[in-house]
């Protein structure tokens, strides 16, 4: 058994040495060009703004979440996407088991499809705005305030959604179905 494993390992090593181990690129833009594109720059700006300290972690119902909703609304409008909610989103509540109501916000935007037969069918694209917010904890006997900025707590998802909205709005004549964000 040990001999079979040695032979199989040797064969795998030979094939690994034969196959080129470098990435293969087709003709076209380089990684540096892609990283410097309008879309990537805009996404970085969105993530930076949405996860900024002033947003205080965007906890549901917080001022930071309200400011994020206002930012998202402004970007949709800048991109020419119809916004169906208020300037800082629509507030909704979720009743919890203990009787408290957790409030949060939604921003709703819309691009109408160009095909009369399909425009009443919808593609729904979403990303959550809220994140963990802030908390206070005790570490080694001292109180520490912590902010969960949330760049990967869906600021990146919001950025992707905003740039997708821009691209879809730019190409809206090609859309058959309507898109709801």
Spans of features found by a protein language model:
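Bacterial Sec-dependent N-terminal signal peptides
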Residues: 1-26
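N-terminal hydrophobic or amphipathic helices/low-complexity stretches enriched
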Residues: 21-67, 72-82, 120-122
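Second-shell loop/turn segments in exported
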Residues: 28-37, 53-63, 93-98, 143-154, ...
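Sec/Tat-exported extracytoplasmic proteins
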Residues: 47, 51-59, 72, 79-83, ...
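Acidic/His- and Gly-rich active-site-bordering loop/insert found
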Residues: 50, 76, 97-139
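A non-catalytic alpha/beta surface segment that caps or lines the substrate-entry region
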Residues: 58-112
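Short secondary-structure junction motifs
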Residues: 86-89, 120, 176-178
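Alpha-helical metal-binding/catalytic segments enriched in His/Glu/Asp
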Residues: 109, 125-126, 131, 136-181
